Amino acid sequence: MKKLLLLIFTLCAVHVTFSQEDTYPMYKGCENKQDVTLENCFNEKLTADILAAFNVPQELISNNYKGTVNVIFLVTKEGNFDVLYVRTAYKELEDEARKVFGNLPKASPATYNGRPVDIRFGMPIQIPLGSQPTPKIIEKVEKQQEIIYEPTAKEDITLITKNSMFPEHTSELNIPFTHSSYADLDYYFNKGENSHTSSKPYLFSDATNHIDLSELKTALFKNKTSKGGKKLWNEHFFSVQKEDYWFTINPMVDLQIGKDNSDNIDFTYNNTRAVQIQGGIGKNLNFSSSFYESQGRFSDYVTDFIRANGVLGASGTVPGRGKGKGLDQGGFDYPIAEAYLSYTPNKFFNFQFGHGKNFIGDGYRSFMLSDVASPYTHFKISTQFWKIKYTNLWMWLDDVRPEVSVNELSPRKYVAMHHLSWNVNKRLNIGLFEAVITENESNRGFDIEFFNPVIFYRAVEFTRGSEGGNAIIGLNSKYKLTNNITAYSQFILDELTVGRFFDGSGYWGNKFAFQLGAKYFNAFKVDNLFLQGELNIARPYTFSNRRSILNYGHFNQPLAHLWGSNFWEAVAIARYKKGRWFGNAKITIGQKGFDENGLNYGGNIYLSNDNRIANEGIDITQGNFTSIFIGDIQAGYVVNPTTNLQFFGGITFRNFDQATQTSTISQQNTTWFTIGLKTDIFNWYFDF
């Protein structure tokens, strides 16, 4: 009886009133009921039949699983029960829900103005059956037209989150961007309609339209009764939730120790201690702040990169993090802070201002905007309506090379960019991209003309003159072959001389890059097996400029692909998880042309392309030809799914074979083994 009452209550969460010309759907056994009595009978009979027929898999029962199977369904104008969407972390539960609804008896349809119409319901099936529900799905009824269900519509699903264990899940905060976690998210985004996946990181509030994040995490919870056990294995370290505000505090670590095959150091290590504070004030404003205190000693080839990329007032650039101060015995000290404010005034706009990273694209790499460089100050506007998502991004960047400093200060430069994502239909997405890089000319800061969010920057750059900036345009696309397979691409154009493009001369000024890739979710019908393949090619001198400060880079690192330009690269990735256990494997092969004998062959975006080797005969991998192979294998265990604290171990094989060895880059064969404990909330890139 309790099970009946609970599901009846949730079915009736929104009361629907029908006029005399309207009738509610009539379920078997309710033929003699009318008006409100008919509605109550429908809810009671339907609930009873669903509970009687629903069988929870024995494995979940044995594991004391608790969760919700949220079902969105239609009672069609033909009287059939048509399941539109099932949201659950387990395919077995989804299959069971679809089977139960598929076997329900035919009902008499609802009517409006005397004609049959579709009516939509939302029902949470609580596991164990009859347990007290925490979230409730609110039904939405369309009476004047047939319903086309789009899981992205925010009003379709409303979760009650007061005193939730995960207040961030319904906030306007960013989901931390790591390739491993986003491989899981993208599967659910791709299953839905009208989803946009190229602009990252995603907002939690957007993700909840496609996936029940709370259920995914609670499914991994350990049965702990002590407060310490819950904090270690399941929950936020500290959390406060009130009616008008909330915040969480979590300590974070990245503690690693390892060994490579060099004789220069006894062992490698990373020692990061950090704290993250996140919260919300009211319904529309959220904040996040993270501070990292880090020391590390890396494999030889990473140390060579750090020291080769000098920084004013420091020893070098730690990849993806920033300024590194040298320590004894080859280590580096590299503190960093990241923070942002996120404000969402309505369902169309989100505004963010902060210090961090962004990513535009659907691949492992990106030629539009990647997260390989250090964090930067930025202001972002995200606009979403109809089938459009429009992203504006303004970035404050630094050229930290000592040789370009003025009065011991690093020159400032700016990037204004926008990206338009358009869902052409249910399968095809097309994106348009434009960015312009300018310098701090006459110390006047960001040119006000570039704050126009809808202007074409290339035209502004043209009117300001050839020295006014460096513009880049691009096109990306994604095609959903099935719910499990997607193909994606990017094309970036830095400069083009049309008359020289097809003449076969290899003209240097035709600077472009492109990407082709595919993703396969639940590959070969193996749950949670993810496969990805990707090809990246960049012409020499792409992303560079005659004035090096106007290159597409920040803090000695590219804003696009980690390898800069003048290369081709192929990447193959496999990921698998089972409960809290996970494994990742990645193979990278490629060829790149490096500079030699003081000549600029087009691989270093920080060199002026005025010093190019020639105007014609420019080919990919020209210069000091280098073959690169990198194999990376990692396995681990998620200690806390709420904070993504992980224990892991991994091994990296790297073969770097140059035609000619130089003083800065030498031929190396590296085997690097690491184990550690880390809070996995950002990407490390050592595949260069």
Predicted feature locations:
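Short N-terminal segments immediately surrounding and downstream of signal-peptide cleavage
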Residues: 21-36, 153-171
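Exposed, low-structure sequence patches enriched in small/polar residues
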Residues: 334, 428-688
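Charge-biased low-complexity segments
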Residues: 5-6, 17-148
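A mature extracytoplasmic/lumenal domain signature
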Residues: 73, 85-88, 123, 129, ...
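Outer-membrane beta-barrel channel domains
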Residues: 155-429, 436, 440, 503-512, ...
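Residue-level preference for beta-strand/loop junctions
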Residues: 65-67, 117-119, 269, 333, ...
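Generic short beta-strand segments
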Residues: 105-106, 251-259, 651-654
